[in-house]
């Protein structure tokens, strides 16, 4: 049977889902709303419109055409926001460079992406100076100067400076229509093994992620919401999965936006206070730093809503945030998923639950957002029961998931084996549809034939008074196969012993909450927990150091 395909009139407009369409509403309805960069720069949406056009004209003068890859090395700024729009709207590809990678890895990603133009903030001149002769495809360097940044000696052949280029360019640019499946962005995953892998997204995918997530965030009756009265500040780097796609959402909504530059805790806390920030997103490490810094201790955060992602939200950290009035909750996804798949928003009626139950819901992986087909499956790809007990791998489908890794067909096939994107996260789903990740496939511990969730043990230890941070890893054991080891960072001036931690975890074993195999064999007190370039706990490194 043949499908009856809709036919269009000869004059009908086949509306492509292009990033430029996201600007139609804010440029009319929010012309006078502010976009702020640190304490250095303020502009309106009307000015943003002009600067996007100026950037496109300037890049055109330097040879950027449809399909050209433009790489950016900058802190979170208004310039990055301009690049988010101008570059893909030209039909070019925006590469957001992870500036926390090693120089060799940065060179690899730029070469692998085939970037021809590189925008470089002053702070990264030493890095680019050290790799410029290894950049095989870059033909044009553009300098991003900034007041207060120290200019190091270099021999980089800059063609122009960013603001000078914009000043010399027209405020009029006609952004063309083209296929909505055109690649818009590229960035590189930062796994703990092998070379970084290129992930890419099309205009259609980014528009659908933006609209769907905007609807999901606006839907709660109260709390865990993002609405047009909010003031937005990203605390996830703009080089990392488009800062979770939130700058696109904030711009569509036309809200006041605040870009903090380099993440310095006291500066971030001051911006929250002085600019009235009410909505952000970050990894738990950043939230922990903000709560602990001097400015953070005296800043009223009672109007602040924060999504935590990039790893589990320990209940201890969540409680500390809630005690400060912060409306904190989990968002889940990964680089390959654009990234958001689920949100841990409280359902209607949750206000009747006791504090511990509400805390538990906020720390879950959450419920899938609209259009996401998320399943937990066994090794045969059979879906498991939604009973809150059966655990398997999370696999997903959604219209914004990357279709593969750039120039890596073998890894792409593995990613999409069986027609679903594989996350390598182990989880269960309860009868209400809430997902709860129990571990990463590579981090789960098998002791005495029993599976031990490192995340569950971390969560319990994080609730012990005096614990600042914790990571649990498995080490080899002749008798048990593996045994859990807890690495603990204590709060300043607190006296806690190894036996204190063990007895705390043992109490949950005695009550039947966890297996006795989950009680750490050893507790090591450390000064800090190693992190990856995007702020996640680096368990591979920890295993190498402590196993």
Where are these regions (language model features)?
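Conserved beta-loop-beta connector loops within the AMP-binding
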Residues: 368-395, 429-432, 494-498, 537-538
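AMP-binding/adenylate-forming catalytic core of the ANL superfamily
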Residues: 101, 107-108, 118-122, 272, ...
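Structural core segment of the AMP-binding/adenylate-forming
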Residues: 61-62, 89-164, 492-494
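Conserved AMP-binding A3 loop
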Residues: 44-46, 184-212
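Conserved AMP-binding/adenylate-forming core of the ANL superfamily
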Residues: 33-77, 81-85, 102-107, 163
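Conserved pre-ATP/AMP-binding loop-to-beta segment of ANL
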Residues: 31, 142, 167-188, 195, ...
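Gly/Ser/Thr-rich phosphate-binding loop
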Residues: 252, 274-282, 291-360, 373, ...
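Conserved AMP-binding/adenylation subdomain of ANL enzymes
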Residues: 207-231, 239-278, 293
């Amino acid at each position: 049977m043949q499908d009856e395909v809709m036919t269009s009139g000869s004059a009908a407009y086949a509306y492509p889902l292009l990033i430029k369409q996201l600007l139609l509403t804010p440029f009319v309805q929010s012309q006078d709303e502010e976009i702020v960069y640190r304490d250095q720069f303020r502009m309106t949406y009307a000015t943003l419109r002009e600067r996007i056009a100026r950037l496109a004209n300037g890049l055109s003068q330097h040879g950027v055409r449809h399909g050209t890859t433009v790489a950016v090395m900058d802190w979170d700024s208004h310039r990055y926001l301009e690049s988010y729009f101008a570059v893909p709207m030209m039909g070019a590809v925006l590469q957001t460079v992870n500036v926390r990678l090693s120089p060799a890895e940065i060179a690899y990603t730029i070469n692998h992406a085939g970037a021809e133009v590189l925008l470089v903030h002053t702070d990264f001149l030493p890095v680019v100076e050290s790799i410029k002769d290894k950049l095989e495809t870059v033909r044009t360097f553009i300098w991003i100067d900034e007041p207060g940044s120290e200019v190091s000696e270099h021999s980089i052949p800059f063609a122009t400076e960013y603001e000078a280029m914009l000043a010399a360019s027209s405020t009029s640019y006609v952004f063309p229509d083209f296929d909505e499946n055109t690649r818009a962005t590229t960035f590189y995953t930062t796994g703990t093994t092998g070379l970084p892998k290129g992930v890419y997204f099309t205009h259609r995918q980014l528009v659908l992620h933006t609209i769907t997530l905007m609807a999901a965030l606006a839907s709660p009756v109260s709390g865990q919401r993002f609405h047009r009265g909010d003031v937005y500040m990203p605390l996830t780097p703009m080089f990392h999965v488009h800062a979770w796609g939130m700058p696109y959402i904030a711009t569509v909504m036309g809200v006041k936006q605040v870009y903090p530059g380099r993440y310095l805790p006291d500066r971030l806390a001051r911006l929250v206070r002085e600019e009235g920030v009410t909505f952000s997103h970050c990894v738990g490490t950043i939230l922990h730093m903000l709560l602990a810094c001097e400015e953070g201790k005296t800043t009223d955060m009672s109007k602040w809503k924060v999504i935590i992602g990039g790893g589990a939200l320990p209940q201890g950290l969540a409680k500390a945030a809630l005690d400060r009035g912060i409306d904190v909750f989990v968002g889940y996804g990964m680089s390959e998923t654009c990234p958001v798949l689920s949100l841990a928003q409280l359902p209607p009626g949750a206000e009747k639950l006791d504090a511990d139950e509400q805390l538990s819901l906020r720390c879950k992986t959450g419920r899938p957002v609209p259009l996401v087909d998320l399943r937990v499956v066994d090794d045969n790809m059979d879906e498991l029961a939604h009973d809150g007990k059966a655990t398997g791998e999370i696999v997903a489908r959604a219209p914004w998931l990357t279709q593969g890794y750039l120039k890596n067909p073998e890894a792409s096939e593995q990613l999409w084996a069986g027609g679903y994107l594989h996350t390598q996260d182990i989880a269960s789903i309860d009868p209400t549809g809430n997902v709860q990740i129990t571990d990463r496939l590579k981090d789960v511990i098998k002791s005495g034939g029993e599976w031990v969730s490192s995340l569950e043990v971390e969560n319990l230890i994080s609730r012990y008074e005096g614990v600042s941070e914790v990571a649990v890893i498995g080490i080899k054991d002749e008798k048990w196969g593996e045994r859990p080891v807890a690495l603990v960072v204590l709060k300043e001036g607190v006296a806690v012993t190894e036996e204190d931690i063990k007895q705390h975890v043992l109490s949950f074993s005695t009550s039947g909450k966890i297996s006795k195999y989950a009680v750490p064999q050893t507790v090591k007190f450390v000064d800090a927990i190693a992190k990856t370039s995007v702020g996640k706990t680096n368990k591979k490194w920890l295993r190498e150091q402590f196993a």
